[in-house]
């Protein structure tokens, strides 16, 4: 099994065909945005205040693990403000001219959403600073002694940046965001509501117990919950009568090798490698990546956050350590 095939991976090329469905079931308004109560309450006030002043919303940085709804929240902000949203990502903006082209096409109070903003090149960042602060674009024309700088006025706009690695942002960029929101892993009750809403949007027959079973195994992540829901739907249609109850969901998820903690093959492989190959740790990230045949970034950004948050794994200065809870989960004696 490779990373692209992981059913519970928050990001997967294998499921790009279902991105259209993902967009269809995303909430469009704050009132429909389930969970993240502190974020929703704050953003409701900030948006209303900006509308009362007839101003652009202050620049917004959203960070947190993958799949928690950063893109969804950015689109909700644009919808609530009643403005257009332009979407791009850090790696796509290779040259200053790429960013300049986007900025000069914005209308007043529009939203520019940059995903993976921590991957912006230093050259592009330099162009972004005056645009965020003064709504001006500084562009160099020509080269050498004949080079000159021209300033282009921009309409007021809102930059929304999303990242899984807030610590990788440079201080000058991070300090220019007036609003910073961290998304946390979702509670099971909130995920249950999300699954029920998605089932309704997809026209599925599902009871609350079935939704709860899916929510329990979704690793606190809405994107994973919706993906599991679609696979459970397939199972229910082929092996049952189409209705999703707790028993059907349990059988489907067991077949998919997703256990009651939301662990899949790669989670178990990582924890077992630490316990069996490295005597429980500590083990460095390079050795761990080599042992399980996975990229370091995938381990740090996709696998580890949930395992650490749930208390199965610890990061220490000396390396990764499997906790007592991990040994208990697998029934292995230390």
UniProtKB/Swiss-Prot annotation:
Keywords: ATP-binding, Cytoplasm, DNA damage, DNA recombination, DNA repair, DNA-binding, Hydrolase, Nucleotide-binding. It is found in: Cytoplasm. This is Holliday junction branch migration complex subunit RuvB. DNA binds at residues 315, 320. It holds the Pfam family RuvB_N. ATP binds at residues 25-26, 67, 70-72, 133-135, 176, 186, 223. Residues 260-334 are annotated as: Head domain (RuvB-H). One of its GO terms (cellular component) is Holliday junction resolvase complex. The gene is ruvB. One of its GO terms (biological process) is DNA repair. Residues 4-186 are annotated as: Large ATPase domain (RuvB-L). It is an enzyme of class 3 (hydrolase). One of its GO terms (molecular function) is four-way junction helicase activity.
